[in-house]
Structure formats: structure tokens, C-alpha cells
Amino acid sequence: MKHNKQQVLAFFALAVLGGLTVAACPVQAGGFMTPTANTAGWGRAFGGGSLFRNDPSAAFNNPAAMAFIDRPVSQFTLNYANIDIKYKGSAYDYAGNPASITVLDPDTGLPTSTPRTGDGGQGGFEAWAPTGFTVIPINERFAFGLSQVVPMGARTTWDEDWKGRDFAVDTKIETVGLTGSLSFKVNDEFSIGGGGILQHTTGFVSQNVDLYAAAAQSPDLGYTPFPAGQGLALMRVKVDNTSLGWFAGMAWKPTSRDTLGLNYH
């Protein structure tokens, strides 16, 4: 009976840890995310986050874990990204026809369409992303942290005359953040922490706009079926923003060898 209870408890513990592991996975939309873990995290597939002993990336990822760092520690990491993106597929205009170039015959006035066949070429990019972390214990209960991170970004460049030009041509989003954080050790098993981030974002998103196709959707023009692929204009939206954010976390050490963490950004 005792053996069966041990099996049940072991199964229950694994189920809880499995649930925590799933819940800890980051949720993100389209784009690219730069890992903000420490350099050693690459070697362990970022498992365990910033809960390992004397991990300075806790200054950003989970400030509560700084409370268990027993000495000043710093780290600088330079990440290099080489992303290949290629498109294979079809693209259609507003009328459901394959994306094409439309030219009006000067003699007859009738439109002549030539399908676009370009796949956009190499849409990927290369980038360097530096990160740095510093944690300084203040006393037995408090620790202070600083970090410089590149939380996310995006970069795609497609040929201007490719078949998907009405959806994307050139996109660039760059972010950089400076953070400060503080942790408090409640006892030898539990700690909490929080911090703030000053983040600067720059970039642009561009795509072509089919002016005649847009006009064809206007009720003021009686939904006149203008030919697609004729009136084109490049639209570019730029962003340049500096804003404040915050993050918080907690860490619990149920045993001397295990640590569970929860963080919010």
C-alpha cells in the first residue's frame, strides 16, 4: 500500500511539473523574438529559464531569482541571427484572380493582364543582438539588477514586383530595452521581485496598395469593378516610440535542489 502511494505521489508531482512547464511557454504573435536568457541557456535549450544558480539574466526574466544569487555577477552576450525566408504559393487580387499586372490597350481600351510569377526572392535577414545583465546583492534579503535586452524584432525584404506585393514588401521592427529590478527574499525558500523597462522601438511596415481595387470596394462608386493590378502605390507606416513597462516574478525552492518560478512581463 505504501509503495502504491509513492507511485501516486510521484505521478501527481510529474503532472504538476508538466503543467507548470506548459504554462511557462511564452506566448507570442508573428515576428521574431530574441532569447533573453544567459549564454549557458543555449546549451540547455533554455530549460529552467533564469532559475539556475547565479544566473544574471534573472535581472530581466525573473527578478525574484536574484534573491538567491550570493555574489555580484555580470554577463554580456552577442547573438547573431541569419534567417532564411522563402515563399512558395499563390497570391490573389480582390476579385479572386491570380495577382497580375494589368495594362489598358490604348487602341481598344480593354485591360490585358499578365500574372505575376515572382516568389519574392530571399526575404530573410542577418542581425546582431547584444544583451547584458548585472546582479548585485545588497544584503541577505535584497538584490539589485540591471540589464540591456533586445526583446523582439522583425525584418523581411521582398522583391518589389513579386506576386505578394499587395501584402508585404519591406518590414523592419527593432527594439531595445534598459531595465532595473529589485528582489526581496522572504525566507530561504521564497522570494519576490519586480522591475521596470524603458523600451525604444523603431521601424516601418510597407506594402503596395492597389488603388483601383480599393476604389472598387467603395459604395460611393457603385462597386464599379475596376481592373486589379493597374493603379499601384507604395504605402509605408513608420514607428518611433519610447515607452515604459514593468515585470514581476516570484521564486519558490521546495527543496535544496529544485526551484519553481513564475514571471509576468
Regions found by a protein language model. Name each.
Residues 57, 125-130, 174-178, 242-246:
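Residues that define the transmembrane beta-barrel architecture of outer-membrane proteins
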Residues 71, 139-141, 187-189, 255-257:
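Outer-membrane beta-barrel channels and translocator barrels
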Residues 81-85, 149-155, 199-203, 212, ...:
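Structural signature of outer-membrane beta-barrel domains
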